[in-house]
């Protein structure tokens, strides 16, 4: 058997998330159908993480196992010839059998795009930004700093997934200009993320940026470990899985895989 690693970009607008669901269109489902057409057998695809309905990806990583008789297949070209226009393979490579797209990951990066203008809105950006209006950048920056480090993120986890621990480490949280003058991108890098954790953090930060909560609210919520006390979840459409880091482990992964491959393909990370 051979293990193939994929780096995938997709527009999540018309998908019911990543994970396979009966009678619903998902990214995993489309990938498995395409691979099955090539191999003639059912193949299970394993992703680095589950994105929700409407969430996009520039650096989702997945792997699957196939018989060695398919060693000559050019997987990137073959899959892209079968996949619909809203999902594409940025890279495909043979990796060690020890590599696992989820369990080998050291850290992940997500971006969230905000629309800061109230007076007008570009309709074609509606599936990729949250129209939140003007924000106090100073308060926003202060709020982001409280997320850094190792914390119990129970207050920022939505229910629905069984996990062993709610403790995660945030390595970096920053902001920078987006695709247009009216957009701003929040980028967060962490050891891993709980269910809808990034969207919950963004929802809290926007509330702070609007002046409806103090930056110190983040610290208080982390200490409370109570999801019901935290602000509402940010909409799905602004979120993008930007990349997954596997380190120089010999398992077939390097830093920010999605970002690197997207740049090689001429795709800007802020798209």
From Swiss-Prot:
The keyword tRNA processing applies. Transmembrane segments: none annotated. It holds the Pfam family PseudoU_synth_1. Substrate binds at residue 110. Keywords: Isomerase, tRNA processing. The active site is at residue 52. It catalyses: uridine(38/39/40) in tRNA = pseudouridine(38/39/40) in tRNA. It is an enzyme of class 5 (isomerase). Its EC number is 5.4.99.12. GO terms for biological process: tRNA pseudouridine synthesis. Signal peptide: none annotated. GO terms for molecular function: RNA binding; tRNA pseudouridine(38-40) synthase activity. Belongs to the tRNA pseudouridine synthase TruA family. Homodimer. Formation of pseudouridine at positions 38, 39 and 40 in the anticodon stem and loop of transfer RNAs. PANTHER family: PSEUDOURIDYLATE SYNTHASE (PTHR11142), TRNA PSEUDOURIDINE SYNTHASE-LIKE 1 (PTHR11142:SF0). This is tRNA pseudouridine synthase A. It comes from Maridesulfovibrio salexigens (strain ATCC 14822 / DSM 2638 / NCIMB 8403 / VKM B-1763) (Desulfovibrio salexigens). The lineage of its organism: Bacteria, Pseudomonadati, Thermodesulfobacteriota, Desulfovibrionia, Desulfovibrionales.
